[in-house]
Amino acid sequence: FQAEDGIRDRSPSRGLGDVYKRQSMPAKFAETGKAEGFHALCDDMLYQMKRYFDTSITQPIIGMIRHPLEKFMDSNASLFSKRIRKGRVVQGHGALDPEHIHVQGETVLLSSPQEVYKKYSVLDAANDVATLMLQLMVNGREELSEHFHMKYLEVSRDRELDAILPAYLTYSALMHGVRTCEEKVASSNESLGTVALEFFNLAARYSRELH
């Protein structure tokens, strides 16, 4: 994604499906799409989470997240590899929050995220889908989140998306929790600590959906 990438369609789900077809990554550049690459990203988020809260708070949450994630990745390594072969690991957006989506007439514009988040952009397409779904849900737009999910499935014809989506919802919730902690420190806004914990608890909830 480049700054102000335009999608000539009022539906982000349809536009994303088209963009991802053009931006799938060759296997040699798709290491982060492998189970072990994704595992490392999740471990990094869990480690960063421990930096911001007392162990008595984080340890139970980390346990609820880490064990289901590890079991899922051990059992589904072939699913991650299959998605690389099928071109589902893409040069995505990396931070597909509603604030980066702008509708102008018949065009949906996706503005690029901050440079720091671009290192998270080469991932399974499920990452961007999960990010937008999560943000819509936490902002009270559950129906719109599910509508986007169903439309993306229809357009992308991604039969394995729902098998891997809970893992990326877990990861997205972790990342948003860490980002909120960073904002809390930068702004000295203690109330953001509560918001961050809500994201971490969401990550624990999504991890229970892993099979």
Model-predicted segments: where are they?
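Single conserved hydrophobic/aromatic residue that forms the stacking wall/gate
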Residues: F1-Q23
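Short, polar/flexible loop-turn hinges at active-site or ligand-entry regions and domain interfaces
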Residues: R8, R14, K28-A35, N139
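A cross-family kinase active-site recognition segment
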Residues: K21-M64, I84, R88-V89, A163-T170
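Alpha-helix capping and helix-loop boundary segments enriched in small/acidic/polar residues
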Residues: E36, P60, Y117-L123, L136-N139, ...
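An alpha-helical support segment within catalytic cores of ATP-dependent transferases
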Residues: R51-Q91, E198-L210
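Active-site acidic catalytic loop and adjacent metal/ATP-binding pocket
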Residues: A77-A125, H211
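Active-site activation/catalytic loop segments of kinase-like enzymes and analogous catalytic loops
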Residues: V122-S156, Y171-S188
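ATP/Mg2+ or Mg2+-diphosphate-binding catalytic cores
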Residues: V178-H211
